[in-house]
Amino acid sequence: MTKNEIIERCRWARDHNESHPSRQWPMGEQLAVALVLRDRSWLDSTNHTTETATDMVCERAGLSAFEFTGWLNDIRAALETEQR
């Protein structure tokens, strides 16, 4: 699960699914997109907290908690740049 893969998933969610992840994607990707797009209602619907989702994404992406913050911010910055 790379930054570019999650950026593409976020674009799709934003453009085609009211900014929600697709339930057809692997769970790690769903959680990553929900975290990037700040989709708390989606996390709630899957019985995940921000903390449990972060833990799972870190595990799947091979990131430490410290690295995750930068990873998340990089993805958000890339998406924000596109919308300007």
Model segments located where?
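Intrinsically disordered, low-complexity regions enriched in Ser/Pro/Gly/Gln/His and often acidic
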Residues: 5, 18, 35-36, 64
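Polybasic, proline/glycine-rich intrinsically disordered low-complexity segments
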Residues: 19-24, 45-84
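Short, hydrophobic/amphipathic alpha-helical patches that form generic packing surfaces
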Residues: 30-42
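General helical secondary-structure elements
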Residues: 5-10, 34, 56, 72
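Short runs of predominantly hydrophobic/aromatic residues within well-ordered alpha helices
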Residues: 3, 28-33, 50, 68
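Alpha-helical interaction segments
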Residues: 2, 15, 32, 60-61
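Short terminal alpha-helical segments
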Residues: 1-23
